[in-house]
Regions:
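Glycan-recognition and catalytic cores of secretory/periplasmic carbohydrate-active enzymes
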Residues: 1-217
Length: 217
């Protein structure tokens, strides 16, 4: 293989850190690298004013300037990237929740941004626009991701989880095949994304499953 430049897609870096956090509990070097990544978030990660997580890893002044200019002079690019960011909002927050669950701590500034991002996830705007992006229900399933995010950041907001689980099932569940195979081009991967439910607290998972309604075709 070849050593390439830094991957500038933020969720790739974030999920690499979150996955390492799950696997490297006793590894001092791994934990040091994760903490270094978290420390750099203040400079290299940002959100829009409303809390939407920016998709690009904003490393260096030139990269930040180039990304900002593209969003201004290319309206179509801005619209497409905003919808992509909305589709990845819960996928990113899920990884942040994994890091918090693993005991890693964030600066006050970064944690404020995280809370703002969670609030945006609960906003009317997010609930409207997420249906317009191909990166949501058919790709990054909010119905599996939001319950875990809620359990970490806002465990009292159980009704929010009920809503998203139902929306995911309505969009994706095929009662004939008993699988998450509707409205997706990659049914095997989409079915496999059920793994994201394993981080729900056991008691919470049971309560949720008792209250959801499974659609019939």
């Amino acid at each position: 293989g070849r050593v390439l430049s830094i991957d500038s897609t933020f969720n790739h870096q974030l999920w690499f850190a979150a996955s390492a956090a799950s696997a490297g509990e006793e590894n001092k070097e791994v934990n040091n690298r994760i903490n270094r990544f978290i420390k750099k978030l203040s400079d290299n990660w940002n959100t829009a004013q409303n809390g939407r997580i920016i998709h690009s890893l904003l490393t260096g002044k030139k990269r930040k300037l180039r990304e900002g200019v593209k969003r201004i002079i290319k309206p179509r690019y801005k619209k497409e990237i905003v919808l992509k960011e909305i589709g990845y909002q819960t996928f990113n927050l899920y990884a942040f929740a994994m890091l918090i669950d693993a005991g890693f701590q964030f600066s006050d500034d970064v944690y404020r941004r995280l809370k703002k991002s969670v609030n945006y996830m609960q906003s009317k705007e997010f609930k409207k626009l997420i249906y317009l992006t191909k990166y949501s229900f058919s790709y990054n399933p909010p119905g599996w991701e939001i319950p875990y995010i809620i359990s970490v950041f806002k465990p009292e907001a159980t009704n929010e989880s009920h809503y998203w689980i139902n929306q995911q099932l309505k969009h994706s569940y095929d009662s004939k095949d008993k699988s998450m195979s509707l409205n997706t081009a990659d049914l095997h991967t989409h079915n496999a994304r059920i793994y994201e439910c394993v981080r729900w607290p056991d008691s919470y998972f049971k309560i949720e499953m008792d209250k959801i309604s499974i659609p019939t075709n």
